[in-house]
Amino acid sequence: MGKEQELVQAVKAEDVGTAQRLLQRPRPGKAKLLGSTKKINVNFQDPDGFSALHHAALNGNTELISLLLEAQAAVDIKDNKGMRPLHYAAWQGRKEPMKLVLKAGSAVNVPSDEGHIPLHLAAQHGHYDVSEMLLQHQSNPCMVDNSGKTPLDLACEFGRVGVVQLLLSSNMCAALLEPRPGDTTDPNGTSPLHLAAKNGHIDIIRLLLQAGIDINRQTKSGTALHEAALCGKTEVVRLLLDSGINAQVRNTYSQTALDIVHQFTTSQASKEIKQLLREASAALQVRATKDYCNNYDLTSLNVKAGDIITVLEQHPDGRWKGCIHDNRTGNDRVGYFPSSLGEAIVKRAGSRTGSEPSPPQGGGSLGPSAPPEEIWVLRKPFAGGDRSGSLSNVAGGRSTGGHALHAGSEGVKLLATVLSQKSVSESSPGDSPVKPPEGSSGAARSQPPAAHAGQVYGEQPPKKLESASASASEGKSAEAVSQWLATFQLQLYAPNFTSAGYDLPTISRMTPEDLTAIGVTKPGHRKKITAEISGLNIPDWLPEHKPANLAVWLSMIGLAQYYKVLVDNGYENIDFITDITWEDLQEIGITKLGHQKKLMLAVRKLAELQKAEYSKYEGGPLRRKTPQSLEMMAIESPPPSEPAAAECQSPKMTTFQDSELSGELQAALSGPAEAGAAAVEKSSNHLPPTPRTTSRESSLSGRARHISSSQELLGDGPPGPGSPMSRSQEYLLDEGMAPGTPPKEVRSSRHGHSVKRASVPPVPGKPRQVLPSGASHFTPPQTPTKAQPGSPQALGGPHGPATAKVKPTPQLLPPTDRPMSPRSLPQSPTHRGFAYVLPQPVEGEVGPPAPGPAPPPVPAAVPTLCLPPETDVEPGRPKKRAHSLNRYAASDSEPERDELLVPAAAGPYATVQRRVGRSHSVRAPAGTDKNVNRSQSFAVRPRKKGPPPPPPKRSSSAMASANLADEPAPDVEAEDGRLGVRAQRRRASDLAGSVDTGSAGSVKSIAAMLELSSIGGGGRAIRRPPEGHPTPRPASPEPGRVATVLASVKHKEAIGPDGEVVNRRRTLSGPVTGLLATARRGSGEPAEQSHFMEDGTARQRLRGPAKGEASAEGPPLARVEASATLKRRIRAKQSQQENVKFILTESDTVKRRPKAKEPDTGPEPPPPLSVYQNGTATVRRRPTSEQAGPPELPPPPPPAEPPPADLMQLPPLPLPDGNARKPVKPPVSPKPILSQPVSKIQGSPTPASKKVPLPGPGSPEVKRAHGTPPPVSPKPPPPPTAPKPAKALAGLQSSSATPSPVPSPARQPPAALIKPASSPPSQSASPVKPPSPGTPALHVPAKPPRAAASVVSGPPVASDCASPGDSARQKLEETSACLAAALQAVEEKIRQEDGQGPRPSSIEEKSTGSILEDIGSMFDDLADQLDAMLE
């Protein structure tokens, strides 16, 4: 590199030594000798045109600059952009470098290629000293750059106050502030004021105004007001308006600032700006008729005859406050002057209508005698009111002006009206001038009359009368508001309410946000007022029918004054008004917040009424109830119906978080409830639901039901349809589905959150159900609380209220309703630990069942095992969970059998939840399962047949279920009926959530599960009906589903709002967490369950059958949830329906749709599960969702081969049929499982082995898995567990669970096997074939000895470790071996059948039935033993 380049680099690096060396003159002698007399080029420029001096100036290094200048570097050398060292020194902003360069003679006014002189750069960057130095060196501040900006423009644009002051104090100030000739046409034309206004620099605007700049100076874009309004600079707009800028100026596009705001902005700031501009455009201006000067009053305004005074407001003593703008100086003089001093002039067409109305209010009310001044003055104060556009609304008198308010142009009319009134009463000097406009005033006037009285709008009562009536009504309402505020010593806010157009009825619907908007900014006062608002008992003041026309409607709500405004703006038809929005109201000039709110409330009510009408014809269970819901929606509910109200007082129907359910949901909830509990609803009808409710109800009924059921479960119970809806619901309705408080979008997110909250004691926990008005409304579904108390599982503390357990007899539920519930279940299974899980009572479903407060019907899909609330539940029911909710995860193709009513034989609990199509359970994508915070799982999942999403890897989940299964036999077994479903469910959820440690078979997780099962299981366990008792177990409707839900929950760890894993329950005794709830609900939800499927292992365990189901889905569900779940037989399911296919719809895990729903031999009640996996070998209860065959086939020996890992890795292959899973058949060796240590079980296997008796698809156990108990105290992995069984289990699990391959199958222990059973169609994918439905497919895995042993004491509880279980163990092992062989045979059969493809359910039922019967005998033995042990 040459010396020049070296010099540039040295200067750039500020290497003074090198620079000096390079610049040093060579010694003459040496130079000659060396021949290097060549002098270094100091002005060498690099590729960018930078010389060494450029770099030195940019760096601000004075030493280098001096060195270079001494070396005769060119001072004004330009770089590629035309920039000189002086430019860079000015830009860098340091005085010393500048001095050096200026002293060297650098030119100050030579521009760069962009037209910038150094002063531009110094001003733009706010370098005061440098700018001052440049001015002292004669820099020209009037030079413009290529964009037409002077240094002052740049300083104003970038907010450089000091530089602006400096420039304005220069001798060039006047020239800088003078408009340039081409400003109005030049697209680049601008001014310092425009730039400062555009960027919100208030201090600079003040400086410019003080310097005398023309405030109304225009460019092509208009005045500075246009710029500030367009850019949302509220304070600038206020300052400019206060400074007297003309708000009526139009730009070259003929737009006023208000037009621009309406057209281009939608922000909150724009609302304020609109209000300010409306007020300004309607500002009253008067011409002074004589001179006035009062030197003794410093606040007085000295005026001369002819001065134009802008009236700002009226002083209490009658004087007016005015502003006189001095165009010469640009200053404004503000002060008070006698109202008799001026005559009103209609200078601005839009003269501030908003404010005007207020004057009319005063003047009109005063009568002709009122001086015009009063009218004008009032107007201004009400400028804010104008915003609401209902100043007139507030006071009848005002209304006259109010109309004009709406349309800026109306201002003139308004003014005329006021003037005319004035002239009539006491003519002021200004009256006469105003009279001419009177014609227009007449129009304005006509508006008011109608407005106030609701008179025909065509008629126009005399203005006086009109004003008087308006002011009278306004006065009355204002007085009422004042008195109300006085009752709690906050009357100081009366002006805030009245000026914003609020009357008591509208106040009753105010929210904290509304209070803040009108100026109640102190939290303490706001809270007090909110509390008082909630105490207001104002009857519904909204029209209960759709009026004939807009005029009538407006008069009914007391806003007749807006008739003309609305008609002028295209809302002449009563049907059009329902489409109006807040923004529309602002735009057309209805700016008073109170009037806006009243209008929007009325609009919503109107929309509801219309929807109600439509719904009458549309049909739809929800819709038909619409009318009632409407009635139910009473404003009665806490007065504030808006979001704030919702916040303040959660409506009866609230999400778990207290957030209100969206109007639709509430409506839907109430509607369904109505069906079942019309009477109840009617009682609640006293709260007239808003029409909104009905309309939404119809659309959202399905979802709402889901939500409601979850709420009910929580204990929120659907508030009476009418009860809670009231205020918040209205608001919600207004907002759409938004939760009560958050107006609009909050709702969905809230739901998600609420789901999370559910895990924590949700607000619902409080007996919100008992809302004042809603209490009576509870529909049967609300009863849920009753079951809740007793059921240990009932959402425990946090969810205490949620009665997920209570399940109405599905039979009672009308089929139509029931279907909804299953879907509703999906609501929040994914929500981790979401209490919603308990959507059991679908309100819609409740209808028929509404047997009093009987347990709310559980959504068909929800396996709400009502754990008998230990004792609370009706006797019998609790235990009858057998049928309770067994839902088969029907193959997707299979119609959801939500409707499948459990045969009456099923018993009260046999609410056969409709089977959720596998696709549903599976459907929830793994992602979903992560946390599907479906707001309440609103989305009713379509029953698609798609393969279930891969189950998340949740070995712990599997383990959890296994643990559950293993959980002490005593608990589970002892109370198998109860515990089985309930405890299992609970445990499942507990375990699933907590144990989801991720190690499929981690000993700890297994131990934890066992412990949980042993600890909580017993208490929780629902007592299993005596073995002989065919009462079907309410297996979770779809173990798979529940499992999926659980898994998903697990996956999420049911993370609570605070981030903790809510799902985990340390002990079964612990309150069921949201997870559990989710599981419960999950069973109902197909999609979400698929997520849980990921957790498939746990789930699978939970419902061994789930796998079985999955695989056996096509084939009989016979696949017992074998390993773990023999405990609780799905026989509930079987009894549920003969026609129900044994589709083990893995519902959640595997959800293979291939198997057409196999007809469950449901009719024949499966004998009590012989093997209860509690402590012992887990014979998976065959998920045969219904276990048609009495024999609950013990799961076939778990396929030993497929290592869980492999399977896990295998993507869930859709198994077309249960057979699809061809995983290795579990060897008969399941016995070994007992002996094998859990550790062998591959994480997952243990769970698998433990598989909690997976209730049938709907078995509660599955749910328990969801609950994923936290790894309570990790118990040592049960030593005895045969690896094979584990594998087999794993295979089964994986097959059932894998239906939706989890992204990390590995997590799923054996479930990992996941044979792609998840995808119903693919069969071959996984090596292990889950036992086909017919196959008991459950390996009897050894249960963790410890938990099983400890818990299971007693006869041959198959608790491997259980000391009491030795003989039992042997028997179990023997039976297991036999079963394994039988199962293998069955599997072969099923495989063949599956290969053949789904067959008619009847055929499947037959084949399944025969297989089940074959294996049944074996299981009967096991079941007998287990029953004996349990008892």
From Swiss-Prot:
GO cellular component, one term: glutamatergic synapse
Domain SH3 residues, every copy: 281-347
Annotated stretches, region: Disordered: 348-372, 420-471, 669-1000, 1016-1041, 1072-1372, 1389-1410
Amino acid composition bias (Basic and acidic residues), ranges on this chain: 1148-1160, 1389-1407
Positions where Phosphoserine occurs in the chain: 358, 423, 432, 637, 650, 723, 728, 791, 891, 893, 989, 1069, 1259, 1363
Composition bias, Low complexity: 669-679, 1284-1299, 1309-1327, 1345-1359
Any Gene Ontology biological process: regulation of postsynaptic density assembly
CASK-binding: annotated span: 375-471
Annotated GO MF terms: identical protein binding
ANK repeats: 48-77, 81-110, 114-143, 147-176, 188-217, 220-249
PTM-bearing positions, type Phosphotyrosine: 253
Biased composition annotated in UniProt, kind: Polar residues: 420-430, 692-712, 1236-1247
Self-association state and partner proteins as the record states: Binds the CaM kinase domain of CASK. Forms a ternary complex with CASK and LIN7A, LIN7B or LIN7C. Competes with APBA1 that forms a similar complex with CASK and LIN7 proteins. The tripartite complex CASKIN1/CASK/LIN7(A/B/C) binds the cytoplasmic tail of NRXN1. Polymerizes, via the tandem SAM domains, to form long, 8 nM wide fibers, upon which other proteins can assemble.
Function recorded in the entry: May link the scaffolding protein CASK to downstream intracellular effectors.
Name of the protein in its database record: Caskin-1
Recorded name of the encoding gene: Caskin1
